[in-house]
A protein has these predicted regions:
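Conserved N-terminal beta1-alpha1 strand-loop-helix module at the mouth
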Residues: 1-78, 94-99, 153-154, 161, ...
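Glycine-rich phosphate-binding active-site loops on the catalytic face of alpha/beta enzymes
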Residues: 81-91, 125-133, 162-180
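Short, flexible coil/turn micro-motifs enriched in small/turn-prone residues
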Residues: 56-58, 144, 165
């Protein structure tokens, strides 16, 4: 699940604690992966460290990776993975050099072959709703695809039937306070 907390969560301990309580509820319901968009903000680092300490048994990652600093921050706090919004082979190589899982986000399908040539085994397709009629996942048996873009928990079964191994629950499924 991709959680996009409201900006005031980073500066307000009460809001952080409420957010952590909400996250705990969905973890108790079976959530295995959680990612929050990277922010160039010390308070983001603090919140992510709190998540890492409070929930050591789930996979926690960062999204919207844009530069080497965002990867360095994710490495520094011990995140399990990060996701790029767009394909960037320089960032992908930097992540690989640092032995860190960076999942490419492909907005343009013409980048798919390039990502595969870099031996990407997990690829995020964004926005998935625009790509579903033209992308046959059965042609890529060794790749794990993740669907993203305006999806909710209610979309899970549909995208699983299309061959996606996971979907990212975004703003449609989590408005910053409530889960659908």
């Amino acid at each position: 699940m991709l959680a996009r907390p409201r900006k005031n969560i980073y500066d307000n301990k009460i809001n952080q604690n409420q957010f952590l309580q909400r996250v705990e509820k969905i973890i108790d319901s079976g959530l295995k992966f959680l990612e929050l968009p990277w922010e160039d903000n010390d308070n983001w680092l603090t919140l992510m460290q709190r998540l890492r300490l409070k929930f050591p048994n789930i996979q926690i990652g960062s999204s919207t990776i844009k530069n080497k600093k965002s990867i360095d921050d994710s490495l520094h706090i011990g995140l399990n993975f990060s996701m790029m919004r767009f394909w960037d082979k320089e960032l992908f190589n930097y992540s690989r050099e640092n032995n860190f899982l960076l999942i490419p986000g492909l907005r343009q399908l013409n980048h798919l072959n390039e990502a595969i040539s870099y031996n990407c085994k997990i690829i995020k397709i964004f926005p998935v709703k625009e790509k579903e009629p033209i992308l046959d996942l059965n042609n890529f048996k060794k790749i794990t695809f993740i669907g993203a873009g305006d999806l909710s928990i209610k979309d899970l079964n549909n995208y699983k039937s299309l061959g996606y191994k996971a979907i990212i629950i975004g703003q449609k499924g989590f408005d910053g306070e409530n889960f659908d």
